[in-house]
């Protein structure tokens, strides 16, 4: 269910092209902000792994910038809205008090 090479990540029906900076879901292009693109890329690089808010902050925003942890929640909400816009199943799992994971088996 997961495939990746140097420039392309695939998970379920989501394809992320790193070099072209493009994302599609079920063949439909999805336009993401640079921050949401980085978040999705990080989640897709390790599907199933729960990423803490702290880890997401340091990898996506960089350790030099002070950003509140709830900023992660706001961007995850935006990312969910964009990748689920076509009525697709939500693949981002929230682990309360911990962080987020990309998970194809939510609620199964």
Feature roles, as predicted:
Residues 102-108:
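Intrinsically disordered, low-complexity protein-interaction/activation regions
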Residues 20-22, 27-91, 96-98:
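Positively charged, aromatic-enriched patches within helix-turn-helix-type DNA-binding elements
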């Amino acid at each position: 269910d997961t495939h990746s090479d140097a420039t392309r990540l695939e998970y379920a029906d989501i394809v992320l092209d790193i070099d072209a900076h493009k994302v599609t879901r079920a063949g439909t292009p999805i336009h993401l902000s640079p921050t949401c693109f980085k978040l999705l890329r990080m989640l897709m690089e390790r599907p199933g792994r729960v990423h803490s808010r702290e880890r997401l902050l340091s990898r996506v925003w960089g350790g030099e910038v002070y950003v509140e942890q709830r900023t992660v929640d706001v961007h995850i909400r935006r990312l969910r809205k964009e990748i689920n816009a076509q009525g697709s199943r939500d693949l981002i799992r929230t682990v309360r008090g911990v962080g987020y994971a990309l998970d194809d088996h939510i609620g199964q």
